[in-house]
């Protein structure tokens, strides 16, 4: 999150001031530095992150192609498929609806036919939480699109602070509040009053909704030019991040 905070400020500033090819170039340079840092320090990780059964990866899956190489190959083919689907937005919607319907139908059928009552209930709860998670992230990730456009068009900013730089608020709040939330969950867990996972999901959705409600409130205080004070945007990001 320190990297996300610094990178968002730098890349957005460079992109706005000198051109987005430089902004994206700086982002690419940062990722290369991050990869080099990881590869340099991987020797200190020991077996952490290693596959539990590494011998299985070396076994041949097709002719002389190992399981590991097959994973790389099919991963690359999926990149091509996803790229194609993105170009064909209409077909993408049909594809996602079809895959989603088939997947959910199979899971429900499997729950009814193969699972015990306890297992079935847990899987159905998991499906509900997945749906809540999809809703949360669909709203949260508006930060990179509609909320940035809203910031650019409808928020009073300083002379050098661009709309893209507001993306740094999320990692900033994470850095500042991570110790606070860690202490809260440690304390509540120790006392036996920590909220359950479904309750945490509910709180997250409520806070995302409150974040957008803050923008609605801010619109009531908009000036003649339709712009709102930056404090409303900051409060929205705070609510979304803590959610």
Model-based region annotation:
Residues 12-159, 181, 185-193:
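Intracellular loop-helix junctions on the cytosolic face of multi-pass helical membrane proteins
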Residues 1-15, 26-27, 31-34, 125-139, ...:
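Membrane-embedded alpha-helical bundles of multi-pass transporters/translocases
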């Amino acid at each position: 999150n320190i990297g996300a905070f610094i990178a968002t400020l730098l890349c957005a500033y460079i992109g706005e001031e000198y051109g987005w090819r430089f902004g994206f170039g700086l982002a690419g340079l940062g990722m290369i530095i991050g990869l080099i840092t990881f590869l340099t320090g991987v020797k200190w990780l020991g077996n952490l992150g290693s596959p539990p059964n590494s011998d299985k990866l070396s076994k041949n899956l097709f002719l002389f192609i190992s399981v590991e190489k097959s994973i790389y190959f099919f991963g690359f083919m999926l990149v091509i498929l996803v790229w194609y689907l993105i170009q064909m937005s209409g077909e993408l919607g049909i594809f996602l609806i079809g895959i989603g319907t088939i997947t959910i139908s199979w899971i429900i059928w499997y729950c009814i036919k193969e699972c015990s009552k306890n297992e079935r209930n847990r899987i159905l709860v998991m499906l509900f939480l997945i749906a809540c998670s999809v809703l949360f992230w669909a709203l949260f990730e508006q930060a990179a699109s509609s909320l940035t456009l809203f910031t650019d068009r409808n928020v009073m900013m300083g002379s050098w602070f661009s709309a893209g730089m507001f993306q740094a608020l999320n990692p900033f709040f994470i850095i500042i509040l991570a110790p606070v939330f860690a202490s809260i969950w440690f304390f509540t867990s120790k006392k036996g009053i920590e909220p359950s996972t479904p309750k945490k999901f509910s709180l997250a959705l409520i806070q995302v909704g409150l974040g957008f409600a803050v923008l609605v409130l801010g619109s009531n205080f908009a000036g003649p030019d339709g712009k709102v004070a930056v404090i409303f945007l900051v409060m929205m990001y705070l609510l979304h991040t803590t959610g």
